[in-house]
C-alpha cells in the first residue's frame, strides 16, 4: 500500500520528520557523520541564507554535530538527536558565536516553525510514499524539500540493505537551484551539492532519481544543475522557451532540427535523450479514456 505524508507547520500534532534521522550505512557507512554534517550545513544555509554562513559558523556547527551524534553512532540504538539537541549543544558552548547561531536557529528548533525538530512520528515503511510539503509556506518549503530528500536517502539505504530497488521522483526540483545567480553559481550551494551527491550515488544504491520541473531556466543558471543535465542518461523535454532551447542545445549537443520539436510543441510532444541518442516523440492520450481522466490536471476537466 501507499501513504501520503503531509507536512505542515500549522499543525503541531501532525506528521513530523526528524531532520537529523540517520540510518546505519548513511554516506556509504564509512564516514556517516561527514555527509550528515554537510546536510546540516545545507539545512542551516536554507534556513538562514548563504550570505549569512561564515567559515567559523561551519566549524562551530560541525563540532556540535559531532557532539550530539557521539552516543547514537556507537550502535545506532535508541533515538537519533534532533535539531532541538543541536540548539541545546550550541547554547552550552562558551563561544558567543555559537550562541548567535543557536538564536538564529531558535525559530526552527524551539519556535513556531519547529516542524522538523521532533522525532519522526510517521510510518516510512510503506511501499509507496508521497511527501506533500505544499502547506509548509515559503519560509519552510525549500527546507522541507531538503529534509524530504534526506529522509528518502535514509530509505534508499535501508532498501539497499534489504535488496530492494527504489524509484524516487522529485517534483519542482528547480527549488534546489532557485536562487542561482547570473554568474552561474548557486547561492544555495550546499543544497544543490547535496542533491548532486544523491544524483550520483543513488544508482549504485539500487535506486533511480528523476527530477521534474517546469522552470528549466532556474536550473540552467546553476553549474551543478547543468552538470546533472549533461550527465543524465535519460532526459525528456517538452515545449521550451527560445532562450532555454538555445542553452539546452549547446549543453546537449543537439541540432536546430532536433530542437525544433520543442518549439511551440503541443501537449504530449517533445524530445527524448537516451544516452547519446536524441529522438522526437508524440504521446497523445485519448481524452475518452479512464487513464486520461485520472492523469489530467487541466482546470475544468474531471
Segments predicted by a language model, with ranges:
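H-loop/switch region of ABC-family ATPase nucleotide-binding domains
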Residues: 213
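P-loop NTPase motor domains
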Residues: 1-2, 7-11, 15-207, 220-223, ...
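C-terminal regions of RecA-like/P-loop NTPase motor modules
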Residues: 219-302
